[in-house]
Swiss-Prot record:
Originating species: Vesicomyosocius okutanii subsp. Calyptogena okutanii (strain HA)
Oligomer and partners: Acetyl-CoA carboxylase is a heterohexamer composed of biotin carboxyl carrier protein (AccB), biotin carboxylase (AccC) and two subunits each of ACCase subunit alpha (AccA) and ACCase subunit beta (AccD).
Short name of any one Pfam family annotated for the protein: ACCA
Gene3D superfamilies found in the cross-reference section: 2-enoyl-CoA Hydratase, Chain A, domain 1 (3.90.226.10)
Name of this chain's protein: Acetyl-coenzyme A carboxylase carboxyl transferase subunit alpha
Biological processes per GO annotation: fatty acid biosynthetic process; malonyl-CoA biosynthetic process
One Gene Ontology term of the molecular function aspect: ATP binding
Keywords: ATP-binding, Cytoplasm, Fatty acid biosynthesis, Fatty acid metabolism, Lipid biosynthesis, Lipid metabolism, Nucleotide-binding, Transferase
Compartment(s) where it occurs, according to its Swiss-Prot or TrEMBL record: Cytoplasm
Alphabetical list of InterPro entries matching this protein: Acetyl_CoA_COase_a_su, ClpP/crotonase-like_dom_sf, COA_CT_C
E.C. numbers: 2.1.3.15
Length: 322
């Protein structure tokens, strides 16, 4: 089993391995055999693309949840240098310390200064420890708020990348006021007089995501998720069985398609065929195009209108008809 592929991707992995094997022997083959190998590679690639389209056309919510956490999926730091022209990182909350799980600083997008804030997970063991598996502590959210206030002062739009399983639930974080830090961000962002765009690039977990996700435009990548609890957490509470995470995922309606339908998000960013991990370069281009387009659109609105629209959006969440 290829560990770079999820269970439902294994048929694709088998074809890709065959393609790689043929590609490796192509250089050693004579002219006649090389032409034959090239034709076989073309046929296998065509078969792989067709199979990928078939599999990804009918993904379950649980399979999309797995894609959102794919080990090869791009994280916040992977995007910065390609999406933004410049980036200068700023550190610390000026109260307790610097939380590495929150990356923030001044960036330029299409020659427009913006304040960028994003959640970072980590790929290697050392990185996961450094970034606390993408679970911010109170000082991370207070750093984010400090940067947002700085953006307000200099009339800069704010761009946030959401990718977290949730806020860190450790004793130290609770002692330092985790819930207060999240609540303060929700309160301040709801009336912050500057444009805000949030993008869920992977996993949007509960209040830990919301704390940098109150925005005028909320976007999600096609195979990202956004919910009040993880499928595993929901399954352990509702079904007393974590193995029923697939059922919980269906109930949570956590995918971009469901959330767009419920008007909880505004824009779905299409992913390359097979997901972001199959074509990272194309994913970066797609994100930059949509982000630039939405930023130019939102900048045209007067601040008063922007705040009215934001308030209307927030107050509209949770409404239902009997």
């Amino acid at each position: 089993m290829n560990l770079d592929y999820l269970d439902f991707e294994q048929p694709i992995a088998e074809l890709e391995e065959k393609i790689q094997t043929l590609d490796n022997i192509k250089g050693k083959a004579n002219i006649k055999d090389k032409a034959d190998i090239i034709n076989k590679i073309k046929a296998l690639k065509s078969k792989s693309n067709a199979l990928t389209k078939k599999i990804f056309s009918s993904l379950s919510d649980w399979q999309i949840s797995q894609l959102a956490r794919h080990p090869k999926r791009l994280y916040t730091l992977d995007y910065i240098s390609d999406v933004f022209d410049e980036f200068t990182e700023l550190h610390g909350d000026r109260t307790y310390g610097d939380d590495h799980a929150i990356i923030g600083g001044i960036a330029t997008l299409d020659n427009q200064p913006v304040m960028f804030i994003g959640q970072q997970k980590g790929r290697t063991t050392q990185e996961k420890i450094k970034y606390n598996f993408g679970m911010p502590r109170p000082e991370g959210y207070r750093k984010a708020l400090r940067l947002m206030k700085l953006a307000e002062k200099f009339s800069m739009p704010i761009v946030t990348f959401i990718d977290t399983p949730g806020a860190y639930p450790g004793i130290g974080a609770e002692e330092r006021g985790q819930s207060e830090a999240i609540a303060k961000n929700l309160f301040e962002m709801s009336t912050l007089p500057t444009p805000i765009i949030s993008i869920v690039i992977g996993e949007g977990g509960s209040g830990g995501a919301l704390a940098i996700g109150v925005a005028d435009i909320i976007m999600m990548f096609e195979y990202s998720i956004y919910s009040v609890i993880s499928p595993e957490g929901c399954a352990s509470i509702l079904y007393k069985d974590v193995t029923k995470a697939n059922l919980a995922a269906e109930s949570l309606k956590l995918t971009s398609i469901h959330l767009k339908k419920e008007r909880l998000i505004d824009v779905v960013i299409n992913e390359p065929l097979g997901g972001i991990h199959r074509n990272p370069s194309q994913a970066k281009v797609l994100l930059k195009e949509v982000l630039t387009q939405q930023l130019n659109k939102i900048k045209q609105l007067p601040i008063e209108q922007l705040l009215q629209n934001r308030q209307k959006k927030l107050l509209g969440f949770g409404k239902f008809k009997d």
